[in-house]
């Protein structure tokens, strides 16, 4: 929540910056930087949080249906027995952890990527389509992108983690989507900064 509050002014900043240097350039840069940075950021978050687990896989007994946790593969390659989830009463100690600000910083960095895309995107979508089809042309791809690709992120990400046993594997989905957006957007999308939407009604 703190990282989101700190990042709110950046929506305005990148929106205003796109008026000067172009919307496409900022949005594509946000996608590219995010795709390249996700895994390093989440590795850093794992280390800051004090967890060295790389893989954790559970197995179900085919006869009894009981679930057992396999040893966890640590960063140094050692195997360690899986631990039980801490009771809720212990979570208070995490809130007062002195490294919390580092986690906030790492989340804030990701918020910057979001604002680089979402700051200019409203103006970009309005300028990209003529007035006669703007409502449908703007809302349909926007909501497909958010509803389908974004909405399925937890499901697909968790499925990838479950299939591979690697806690970072779920990041492959947003990385692939961001990379494809950068490639397709860089090659096919036009810059709209100089589009004057009011000229259509003159």
Residues covered by each model-derived region:
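Multi-pass alpha-helical transporter architecture, strongest
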Residues: 38-48, 176-202
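Transmembrane alpha-helices of Major Facilitator/SLC transporters
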Residues: 1-16, 30, 34-42
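Transmembrane alpha-helical segments of major facilitator superfamily
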Residues: 2-7, 110-111, 142, 177
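A late C-terminal transmembrane helix in Major Facilitator Superfamily
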Residues: 126, 132-164
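Cytoplasmic membrane-interface "Motif A"-like loop-to-helix N-cap segments
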Residues: 20-31
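Residue-level signature of mid-helix packing/kink "hotspots" within the transmembrane helices
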Residues: 4-12, 115, 147-151
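Intracellular juxtamembrane helix-capping segments at the cytosolic ends
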Residues: 116-129
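Low-complexity, proline/glycine-enriched hydrophobic segments characteristic of transmembrane helices
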Residues: 42-105
């Amino acid at each position: 929540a703190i990282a989101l509050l700190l990042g709110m002014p950046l929506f305005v900043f990148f929106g205003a910056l796109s008026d000067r240097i172009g919307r496409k350039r900022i949005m594509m840069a946000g996608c590219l930087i995010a795709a390249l940075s996700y895994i390093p950021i989440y590795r850093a978050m794992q280390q800051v949080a004090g967890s060295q687990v790389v893989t954790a896989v559970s197995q179900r007994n085919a006869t009894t249906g009981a679930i057992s946790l396999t040893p966890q593969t640590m960063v140094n390659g050692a195997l360690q027995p899986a631990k039980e989830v801490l009771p809720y009463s212990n979570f208070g100690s995490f809130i007062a952890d002195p490294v919390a600000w580092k986690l906030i910083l790492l989340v804030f960095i990701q918020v910057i990527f979001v604002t680089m895309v979402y700051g200019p995107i409203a103006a970009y979508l309005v300028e990209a389509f003529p007035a006669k089809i703007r409502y449908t042309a703007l809302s349909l791809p926007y909501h497909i992108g958010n509803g389908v690709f974004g909405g399925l992120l937890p499901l697909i990400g968790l499925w990838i983690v479950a299939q591979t046993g690697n806690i970072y594997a779920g990041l492959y989905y947003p990385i692939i989507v961001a990379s494809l957006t950068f490639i397709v957007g860089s090659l096919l999308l036009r810059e709209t900064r100089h589009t004057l939407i009011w000229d259509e009604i003159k």
